[in-house]
Regions:
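Short amphipathic beta-strand/extended segments with alternating polar/hydrophobic composition
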Residues: 38-41, 65-70, 87-104
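Short polybasic amphipathic segments
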Residues: 56, 72-91
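Short, hydrophobic secondary-structure boundary micro-motifs
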Residues: 7-9, 68, 96, 125-128, ...
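C-terminal helix-rich "cap/oligomerization" subdomain common to oxidoreductases
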Residues: 32, 113-153
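Contiguous beta-strand/loop segments that form the cofactor/metal-binding neighborhood of enzyme cores
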Residues: 1-75, 110-121
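Active-site loop of classical SDR/Rossmann-like NAD(P)-dependent oxidoreductases
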Residues: 99-112, 127
Length: 153
């Protein structure tokens, strides 16, 4: 989908952890009239494991996916990561089997590529400065949206 055209967000500190800045965020990314992208992030959940969640959901016209980010549950011990796919022509969810986890593998590949590129061992970088710039542009837009406080009633 790329970079959204706008964002609505509220980001807050947790009252019992005043030494930290914003650790709870709700954001809606505007990709136009046919895409719904809502984020709910809470780094201060302290009510036990029963309803704790660290997940990503994709609900699309041609299928769906559900991802459990297990490391974020009981960090740093964590739980197993899971990926479930509901295919376009499917009638039930299918569990994707894989080895490893998203962390630290998600960072190892990018960082080792950067190190190999700097030594001349890789011809190109897997990621770009432009991508990082667009990510930070989105983060800053979330801060601005939160400061503006939304549409007044």
């Amino acid at each position: 989908l790329g970079t959204p055209k706008a964002v609505w967000a509220q980001t807050l500190a947790y009252p019992a952890s005043t030494e930290f800045a914003q650790t709870r965020t709700t954001a809606i990314l505007n990709y136009g009239p046919s895409v719904r992208c809502a984020l709910s992030i809470n780094h201060n959940y302290s009510k036990g494991p029963r309803h704790q969640a660290a997940e990503i959901r994709f609900d699309c016209e041609k299928g769906a996916a559900w991802v459990k980010l297990g490391l974020l549950l009981d960090y740093p011990k964590g739980e197993a990561d899971e990926v479930w796919i509901y295919p376009k022509a499917g009638s039930d969810w299918e569990k994707a089997e894989f080895a490893g986890g998203w962390f630290p593998e998600a960072f190892i590949g990018t960082m080792s590529n950067l190190q190999r590129f700097s030594k001349g061992e890789d011809d190109s970088l897997l990621t770009s400065v432009e991508d990082a710039f667009q990510t930070m542009k989105l983060v800053e837009a979330c801060y601005r949206s939160s400061e503006e406080g939304g549409t007044l009633l």
